[in-house]
Regions:
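Flexible "stalk/tail and boundary" regions
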Residues: 1-31, 37-92, 96-97, 104-129
Length: 129
């Protein structure tokens, strides 16, 4: 039997997933408002990375730490599969107004211009154009 994956632990210590659908806009400086409910679930520091199907994934620190541990334990021959995830990721911290700056490279990858949808997907959120 395989090991069970760790459950997402928000800062309050209660086990729950990232949920909901939110429509917002990216401003001219590439900033995106993160809704209060998502901030509560994701924490103050999280990582933006290229997701599957041309979206951006927002990972809470705890999930990102699991990726890092897994990457470090892989043999060199298998670690190349995770290189793009780390090479294109950006550590994000919220500003005083609850916004993050999405780097241009990540906006271009996901085709993000102005209007976006943020959805909760269990242990992460995703940003879609």
């Amino acid at each position: 039997m395989g090991e069970k994956p760790a459950k997402f632990q928000p800062s309050g210590g209660k086990v729950r997933g990232v949920t909901g659908t939110y429509e917002h806009s990216i401003d001219a400086k590439g900033r995106l408002f993160i809704p209060a409910k998502l901030r509560e679930e994701l924490g103050v520091t999280f990582y933006l990375a290229m997701g599957v199907d041309a979206c951006l994934a927002i990972y809470p620190q705890s999930t990102w730490d699991r990726f890092t541990e897994k990457f470090a334990s892989l043999p060199m021959s298998q670690s190349k599969a995770m290189r793009p995830l780390f090479a294109n990721a950006a550590k994000c911290e919220l500003d005083s107004q609850g916004r993050i700056v999405i780097p241009q490279k990540l906006r271009k990858y996901a085709g993000l211009d102005k209007d976006v949808v943020i959805i909760g997907v269990h242990d992460r959120a995703e940003i879609w154009s």
